[in-house]
Amino acid sequence: MTESFGNVYEDTERARAYAQLDYPGTYYLAFRDLPMLVHKHVRGIRALDFGCGTGRSTRFLRNLGFQVIGVDVSQAMLAQARDRDPQGDYRWIGEGGLAGLEAGAFDLILAAFTFDNVPDERKIAALPELRRLLARGGRLLVVVSSAAIYLHEWASFSTRDFPENRTARDGDFVRIVMLDVPDRRPVIDVLCSDTHYRELFGAVGLAVIDAFRPLASGAESVSWVSETTISPWTIYILG
């Protein structure tokens, strides 16, 4: 990678844009099947939303009946989360990371899009900590952008202006524009293929129990583009 990595989400304008999102368009597919997967794989009600952003996934888990804590590295995102959900438990994780949380404290940890824009070294640092926080029999659900999302057009995203995405390899920067928000600056993510994710999980002792790739049925009231034939997301269930 030739560009410096920064926390693009520590940006007030982008945080405001994210706060307006619920589950429009392509994002709907990332969350549609989570209740089914949680019911199938998770026992217990203690949850951690790792990389909670503006809190939409935290609220989602609470609506499923979980006692949930949302954590993030972005103060700007957390400010939006607290504004929208004053009763929620949102915590900033700074230099100490997750060290302040008790080992084995969570039956479910959700990381929704948290790993999309971080390099390998940060994934490798975070994954053992998340494993440490899982209760016996607990599950880590990781929702990530599939490699295909950076190659096609979607109801909620565009990549047509970034042909260089096609030659990107694991660890390279890839760009994508969100169409559901006024802020049309490209989001810069770090490509991580399914094979590479599985290597990273295995390296820290996390087993892939299931992997789910959601598709649209075509019956939804959305003008899908690629979503009925190509999955934009992968949901890993780890333990």
Roles of regions detected by a PLM:
Residues 124-136:
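A short glycine-rich, Lys/Arg-flanked "PGG" loop and its adjoining helix->strand segment in the class I
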Residues 48, 54-98:
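Class I SAM-dependent methyltransferase SAM/SAH-binding core
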Residues 1-42, 56, 60:
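Conserved class I S-adenosyl-L-methionine
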Residues 44-46:
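Nucleotide donor/acceptor-binding cores
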Residues 141-199:
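SAM-dependent methyltransferase
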Residues 186, 190-239:
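Conserved Class I S-adenosyl-L-methionine
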Residues 108-122:
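A short SAM/SAH-binding and catalytic strip from SAM-dependent methyltransferases
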Residues 99-109:
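A short acidic, Gly/Pro-enriched loop at the edge of an enzyme's catalytic core
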